[in-house]
Swiss-Prot record:
A Pfam family reported for this protein in Swiss-Prot or TrEMBL: Staphylokinase
InterPro entries, per the entry: SAK, SAK/SK_sf, SK
Residues of the signal peptide: 1-26
Keyword Signal: yes
Protein name per the record: Streptokinase C
Record has Signal as a keyword: yes
Provenance organism: Streptococcus dysgalactiae subsp. equisimilis
Function recorded in the entry: This protein is not a protease, but it activates plasminogen by complexing with it. As a potential virulence factor, it is thought to prevent the formation of effective fibrin barriers around the site of infection, thereby contributing to the invasiveness of the cells.
Keywords: Plasminogen activation, Signal, Virulence
GO CC aspect terms: extracellular region
Length: 440
């Protein structure tokens, strides 16, 4: 009788389809994989949700991939590293296969579940696979577990397998401490990111330094950490200053369940109680006590000294323009619009049929708006007040047979050089605006 990838009393089946990664949260079904580009290595796409034990609550997980080959294509890195137990091996027929251990799969899912946690109250612990967890290949073939709970997947031909369904989870609770740790080495690392777009900033490698050794229950404040960060910034990037803290996370003895510290208020971190750490003495082979570790990892936004934070909603530097297009013969308003622009250099005529002019603000014809057969006459009124600059462009009908790019105002037989010069500052960005707008 086949073993349905039985993990405890629950069956784990496995289902696949084909492709490579797009930025989506979950895989809805086989149809999703049909649109994915072909892959270079065989992969297991893990797209599962968590179901909280004893409730109807579901926990969403972002999908991820596990490379089933010994080396990623193009020198890349796998998104999830698995232990040596899960590795490719040759079958009797010579084809490569990959054996996935149940514990490795659960660990990879646990790490993905934790990766996007933003609060200490949001931690869940993965218990086991639910009964609907399934692996298939692109043909719908189900892959069953061996007696030891592992699953063997072929890596040739190159394809993707899909692990879907659910894992059972429960709120994380710390285990009772049997042998309390005596002291903790508090280590520190920091990462800086420019708040404003900044091509000059070159982040260095993150160095880890030992801050101090503390006893269980001793404290370190957010101000002490800020001082450490500023000291490192002054040394490596003297032209910058810290703007604000983005995150502070404490990793306890490489435990995946970390302490997330507040980022928007002052805090005091109290060294967490935990089990005493040990290592094996290479000579004696016996366990010996070592200092436990807390790694405090921080991220800060920084600014160039003297620079203000960029505000995408700040319009104080923009100027308001009202553009009116008027029939020169009837004074009928053909079209009106208001524009905000940071540069008056864009106040120039554009040809709607010429993509090179797309940054310019004034139109030499209105065909695109269904107002046909008009062109420039050379008459432009330019009026200013404290908050608005009003440009009135007078337009006339094009001669019959002329196309939309015809410029009546550029015809030297109709307008003198002096008349053309009157409005030239609107057409040539290098010509200054008159001191007195009425002197035109």
């Amino acid at each position: 009788m086949k073993n349905y990838l039985s993990f405890g009393m629950f069956a784990l089946l496995f289902a696949l389809t084909f492709g490579t990664v797009n930025s989506v949260q979950a895989i809805a079904g086989p149809e999703w994989l049909l649109d994915r580009p072909s892959v270079n290595n065989s992969q297991l796409v893990v797209s599962v949700a968590g179901t909280v034990e004893g409730t109807n609550q579901d926990i969403s997980l972002k999908f991820f991939e596990i490379d089933l080959t010994s080396r990623p294509a193009h020198g890349g890195k796998t998104e999830q590293g698995l232990s040596p137990k899960s590795k490719p091996f040759a079958t009797d027929s010579g084809a490569m296969s990959h054996k996935l251990e149940k514990a490795d799969l659960l660990k990879a899912i646990q790490e993905q579940l934790i990766a996007n946690v933003h609060s200490n109250d949001d931690y869940f612990e993965v218990i086991d696979f639910a009964s609907d967890a399934t692996i298939t290949d692109r043909n719908g073939k189900v892959y069953f577990a061996d007696k030891d709970g592992s699953v063997t997947l072929p890596t040739q031909p190159v394809q993707e397998f899909l692990l879907s369904g659910h894992v059972r989870v429960r709120p994380y609770k710390e285990k009772p401490i049997q042998n309390q740790a005596k002291s903790v080495d508090v280590e520190y690392t920091v990462q800086f990111t420019p708040l404003n777009p900044d091509d000059d900033f070159r982040p260095g490698l993150k160095d880890t330094k030992l801050l101090k050794t503390l006893a269980i229950g001793d404290t370190i404040t957010s101000q002490e950490l800020l001082a450490q960060a500023q000291s490192i910034l002054n040394k490596n990037h003297p032209g910058y200053t810290i703007y604000e803290r983005d995150s502070s996370i404490v990793t306890h003895d490489n435990d995946i369940f970390r302490t997330i510290l507040p980022m928007d208020q002052e805090f005091t971190y109290r060294v967490k109680n935990r089990e005493q750490a040990y290592r094996i003495n290479k000579k004696s082979g016996l366990n010996e006590e070592i200092n436990n570790t807390d790694l405090i990892s921080e991220k800060y936004y920084v600014l160039k000294k003297g620079e203000k934070p960029y505000d995408p909603f700040d319009r104080s530097h923009l100027k308001l323009f009202t553009i009116k297009y008027v029939d020169v013969d009837t004074n009928e308003l053909l079209k009106s619009e208001q524009l905000l622009t940071a540069s008056e250099r864009n106040l120039d005529f554009r040809d709607l049929y010429d993509p090179r002019d797309k940054a310019k603000l004034l139109y030499n014809n209105l065909d695109a708006f269904g107002i046909m057969d008009y062109t420039l006459t050379g008459k432009v009124e330019d009026n200013h007040d404290d908050t608005n600059r009003i440009i009135t462009v007078y337009m006339g009908k094009r001669p019959e047979g002329e196309n939309a790019s015809y410029h009546l105002a550029y015809d030297k037989d109709r307008y003198t050089e002096e008349e053309r010069e009157v409005y030239s500052y609107l057409r040539y960005t290098g010509t200054p605006i008159p001191d007195n707008p009425n002197d035109k």
